[in-house]
């Protein structure tokens, strides 16, 4: 049985590791990160032991309105991981699968908070596998962070609330 989504805690028994470039195991973690939350931070830190290199890709879509500029998001995330040599932060403005291929990614890393997230990520994983041959690795959200989202943080900011508890400390 071959699945397009691999759970970090149990790889399928027939997983074909020969398809993966094992010289440098690279994962990409992508999103708009407007802003980058403690939930995002948790997923990246939990994925770190699985990879030699993680590229955090900040998606930039000209048709989308952001609260923070791509430069501000890049600065925020770079500051958070300044002491982590395995992490790179980059922006991209094309398909995630094209970004993954450019970065020679072994996996696309995604966090899942709910059934709704799972269903969406499952569809995306299937498309990415079909278009680019790259598997998606799902990491389930720590229950402490499952209610945290960038849109929640933006809403709280809009109403002048303190959001520091939802953002990484650096």
Where in the sequence are the language-model features?
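Low-acidity, Ser/Thr- and Arg-rich intrinsically disordered low-complexity segments
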Residues: 2-18
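Nucleotidyltransferase catalytic core that binds NTPs
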Residues: 15-170
